[in-house]
C-alpha cells in the first residue's frame, strides 16, 4: 500500500489556507484534547490524523492536551495508553504533554471575572429542579430564584465552594445568559460543579471542577490554538465557546470548526460503551482484538500506515455517514499484501500420507514474498506425512471444486502434484487420514504429459509443524448500526472462533506483533499470548472476504 502522497482536499484545509493567505494567522496551531477516561478507538484516529496532519502539512504545531476535568472517571493508565497510541500512529506532539488541570487557577480567575461582570452566579437548585427550570425545546426556561444574587454574595459563595463548604450537588456556578434562548446550551449552563474526588494529577487540591464547555475554549485560548477542531455533536456548543471568550479578558480568540465523526459498521465508537464491554467481560480487555480501540487494532495486526490511509480515504466533511468495515479492511489488506512475508499454516488439520514416497526429508526453497525478491527465501521441510486443511478435501465433488478429491489431482503449494487414493476413518466416520501418491517430476512444474492441474492447496510437514492456536475474529456486534441497538444484546457471541492448527517451522521463533500472510487463509499477527511452547496468531483480515479460500 502506498500512502496517499497528495494532501486530502477538504473544507478545513480551505479555511486554513484562506486564513494564511489573508494574514489572519501566520502560524497554525491545533490540538488533540482527549479525556483520559478510556482507551482511544478508531474514531479518535480520524481526529488525530486531522489535527496532527494539518500541523505537519503547514509546518505548525499540534498539542496533546488531556481534558482532565472529571476525576472520578479518569486514570493514569488511560493517559499512558493515549500517549502510546498517538506515537504508534506516527505523530509527535509539540512541547510537553498538557493538561486542562494546568490551567485550573487561571480558569478560576476567569470565573471570578464573569461573576464580577454579573455574568455568572452561584445556584443552589438541585439537579432535578434545574432540569425543571431549564424548559424544553418548545418551551422557554425560567430563571433560578438564586439568579439575582449580588456580585459580593456570588464571590463569597464561589469561594466557599472552592473551600469545600458545600456538599456535592448542593451548589454550582452557572453562566448568566438567557433562560429563554432557543439554544438549550445557552440557558445558563453550569460552569463549575463540586466533586470531592482524588485527581490523578493534583490530588485533593481542588473540590470544584470546571465543565468541558468552560475549560475547552479557555485552554485553547491560553495555548494560542488557531483552529479548534471537533466533531459535529459540539456544533451548538460553539455558541458557548464564543460567549465565554467574548466575555473574559483574554486576547486570543480561537475559532471552533466541526466535522463529522467516524461511524463504523458493526462496532462501537463510544468509550463509555466500550468500557461496559470490558466491565461485563464480554471481551478480555481494552486491547481485545475484537475491539475498535487502537490497542485492539494493533494487537489484531493493523498497522499505523493502514489506519492513516483509512482516515485519508474517508475524508473530512460535515455529512454524517456510516462507513463500511470493508473500507478499513481494504486498507490493511493492501498494506500487508505488499509488506507481510508469506507462510503456510493449516487451521483444521487432517493427515495426508504420500504412499509412494520414502520417509526421507526434503528441503524446499520457498520465496518469502512472490513479488518481492528482497524479502529473501526460506527452507521448508517436505515429508511423506503432511497436514492439509480438512476443508481442502472431499470424497466426491462437482467440477467447480478445485481442491483434492478422491481419484483426482491437486498441486501442493511450492511442491508436487498429488492424487488422492483412499481415506481412513474413525468409528464416528470422520476422516483421519488421506492416502495419496505424488508425481516426483512435478516439483514446481507442470506434468510432462500435459495433464492440467486445476487446484493448489497448502500444507505443512507433520514431523516439523509447530502447534499453534489460531484466533479467528468476526464483527463485534450483530447489528450494523450500533447507535440504533441495545449494544450488549447485540454483542456477537460468535465474534471469536479458536482453532488448534499447525504452522510451518520457520515461524517457531516469531515475535509478538509480527504479521504474515498465511497463504490461502488470510493475514495473521503473532499475539502477545504466544510463548515458546504455545504460539498464538490473530487473524487480522481474510484475503478477499470469507469465501476467499474457496476461490483457489
Curated annotation (Swiss-Prot):
EC number in record: 6.1.1.18
Protein residues bound to L-glutamine: 67, 212
Organism domain of life: Bacteria
Leading EC class: ligase
Residue sites binding ATP per the record: 35-37, 41-47, 231, 261-262, 269-271
Keywords: Aminoacyl-tRNA synthetase, ATP-binding, Cytoplasm, Ligase, Nucleotide-binding, Protein biosynthesis
The reaction(s) this protein catalyses: tRNA(Gln) + L-glutamine + ATP = L-glutaminyl-tRNA(Gln) + AMP + diphosphate
Swiss-Prot/TrEMBL GO biological process terms: glutaminyl-tRNA aminoacylation; glutamyl-tRNA aminoacylation
Motif range ('HIGH' region): 34-44
Short sequence motif named 'KMSKS' region, residue ranges: 268-272
Compartments where located: Cytoplasm
Pfam families: tRNA-synt_1c (PF00749), tRNA-synt_1c_C (PF03950), tRNA-synt_1c_C2 (PF20974)
Major localization class: cytoplasm
GO molecular function, one term: ATP binding
Family to which this protein belongs: Belongs to the class-I aminoacyl-tRNA synthetase family.
Protein name according to UniProt: Glutamine--tRNA ligase
Gene this protein is translated from: glnS
